């Protein structure tokens, strides 16, 4: 196989007879085998399946045979290797270091039915099936296990914390879809589909409906209408590429493409345009980008799509080097500043060295988790993990911080370097409901049906949070007294943020231009009972033709302007 970059790969295919012969030969030379492997134990042919005859041909290895960029530096081992059981089932996967990274176990009575699998350094996941071949239990020795109950048009999933989720389905012949979901806390969400099985509506646990308009031919989403009636529209070209998005506030973003379908310009909601140029008709990656200020950045790419050089708008260039496996090995910046990266035979970063020879080294466990970082001055920080790769302790400078998790992988206890503890509790939907702090304080949290925070308790303080139909926060109270208030205009932009302080209403009012950019801030202090204005201060914001902020005008003071170069760097 030759890829688009000119690399040639050899796919090594083996037959069942070849694998059987190899297994018998291996058993004869093995010191652990008291007798040779029989033909019945590893047959030369495989039985047929319900899909037809099985010729027993399997992919056993992939070799890199030619690399135009590294013609004299080809790997001496396959990039990946596969082994199989006597029934032709995938048994193990080995990476380019010949390390086994995946392992599989099968049901001897049901060929092809996987009953267990594991990743390198991780516990084994096991599966049980019913008589029809459906998974009824997934067993996780170091985390959540699941049980599955199948009924007519519904599936019940129960985890090892006894949380239950029910999936209600409709349709058939490849169009079965989940139309209703009962969550572990008893809340219910619903989904609607068209005749082709494409999602057209979702109703959340509060009964609010979001609708999706679809192109009947392509299936592209043409509009999304949220429960508050706000609509976002999407437009496409004949190649089904997104060309424009019109947002609920009326602002629009646009994208343009050339004939081969490459992105050539992108215009943001605020009107700034970035343009992309390509070296030739066959280039897939841009050679330059030019932003709204006219500043140009240049990129040079390898034949494999790797960034070789990046030149910013000031002419500052950064160069990159890679090894034959595509891993970055060096970064060269201006003024001789370089970093060199080294990897082990599994592709894991083992060291980073600068031009002065200062080196940071990295160590890993069998699962690939980063276990130690040794800095150039010899300081060593270590991290220990549980069976599933979650950090359980970190040690740095002789101080250790440790974490404990529940079966769902949620942090339930954190012990800091001073030995102080913080504990965490969660609801059935994994939301934090209580936290015991290092200082002994207890904080509690309550949520609505859609997951928004509605009440927080901090010792004697009870804060209530309120939202509008668009899920925007509108106000909050503390122990029944009004606190902050948020107000929005018809575009959904924040116009006022206010609170009461020492008996006065303190507010900040925001103004915008037609592109949604902030043009003014007005701070006021009022008598909340009479509305009398006691104090105010205004600040204006202005932008140049390229859309960059270039002037701030404080109240009753001369404007403050600044000069920029390139894409807005302060001169």
Question: Predicted regions span which residues?
Answer:
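Extended charged/polar low-complexity repeat regions
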Residues: 1-571
């Amino acid at each position: 196989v030759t890829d688009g970059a000119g690399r040639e790969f050899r796919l090594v295919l083996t037959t069942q007879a070849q694998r059987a012969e190899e297994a018998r030969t291996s058993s004869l030379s093995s010191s652990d085998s008291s007798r040779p492997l029989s033909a019945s134990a590893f047959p030369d042919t495989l039985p047929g399946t319900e899909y037809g005859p099985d010729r027993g041909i399997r992919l056993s290895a992939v070799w890199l045979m030619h690399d135009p960029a590294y013609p004299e530096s080809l790997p001496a081992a396959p990039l990946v290797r596969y082994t199989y059981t006597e029934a032709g089932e995938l048994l193990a996967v080995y990476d380019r270091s010949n390390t086994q990274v995946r392992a599989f176990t099968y049901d001897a009575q049901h060929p092809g039915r996987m009953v267990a699998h594991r990743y390198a350094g991780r516990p084994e996941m096991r599966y049980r099936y019913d008589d029809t071949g459906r998974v009824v239990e997934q067993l996780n020795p170091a985390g959540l296990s699941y049980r599955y109950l199948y009924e007519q048009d519904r599936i019940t999933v129960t985890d090892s914390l006894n949380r239950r989720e029910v999936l209600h389905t409709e349709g058939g012949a490849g169009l079965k879809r989940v139309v209703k979901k009962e969550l572990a806390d008893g809340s219910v969400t619903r989904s609607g589909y068209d005749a082709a099985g494409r999602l057209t509506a979702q109703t959340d646990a509060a009964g609010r409906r979001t609708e999706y308009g679809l192109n009947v031919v392509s299936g592209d989403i043409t509009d999304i209408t949220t429960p508050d009636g706000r609509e976002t529209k999407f437009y496409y070209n004949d190649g089904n590429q997104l060309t424009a998005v019109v947002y609920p506030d009326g602002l629009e973003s646009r994208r343009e493409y050339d004939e081969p379908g490459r992105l050539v310009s992108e215009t943001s909601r605020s009107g700034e345009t970035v343009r992309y140029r390509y070296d030739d008709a066959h280039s897939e990656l841009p050679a330059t980008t030019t932003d709204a200020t006219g500043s140009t950045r240049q990129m040079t790419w390898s034949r494999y799509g790797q960034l070789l050089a990046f030149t910013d708008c000031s002419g500052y260039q950064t160069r990159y080097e890679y090894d034959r496996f595509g891993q970055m090995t060096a970064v060269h910046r201006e003024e001789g500043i370089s970093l060199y990266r080294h990897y082990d035979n599994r592709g894991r970063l083992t060291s980073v060295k600068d031009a002065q020879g200062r080196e940071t080294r990295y160590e890993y466990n069998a699962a690939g988790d980063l276990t130690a970082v040794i800095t150039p001055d010899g300081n060593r920080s270590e991290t220990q993990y549980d069976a599933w790769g979650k950090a359980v302790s970190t040690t740095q400078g002789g101080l250790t911080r440790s974490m404990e998790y529940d079966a769902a992988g949620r942090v339930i206890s954190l012990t800091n370097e001073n030995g102080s503890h913080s504990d965490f509790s969660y609801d059935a939907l994994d939301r934090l409901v209580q936290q015991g702090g290092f200082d002994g304080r207890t904080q509690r949290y309550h949520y609505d049906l859609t997951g928004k925070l509605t009440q927080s308790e901090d010792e004697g303080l009870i804060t209530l949070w309120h939202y509008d139909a668009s899920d925007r926060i509108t106000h909050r109270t503390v122990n029944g007294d009004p606190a902050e208030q948020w107000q929005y205009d018809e575009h959904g932009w924040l116009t006022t943020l206010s609170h009461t302080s020492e008996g006065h209403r303190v507010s900040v009012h925001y103004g915008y231009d037609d592109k949604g950019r902030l043009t003014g801030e007005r701070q006021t202090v009022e008598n909340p009972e009479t509305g009398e204005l006691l104090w105010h201060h205004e600040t204006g914001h202005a932008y140049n033709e390229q859309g960059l902020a270039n002037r701030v005008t404080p109240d009753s003071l001369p404007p403050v302007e600044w000069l920029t170069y390139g894409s807005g760097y302060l001169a």
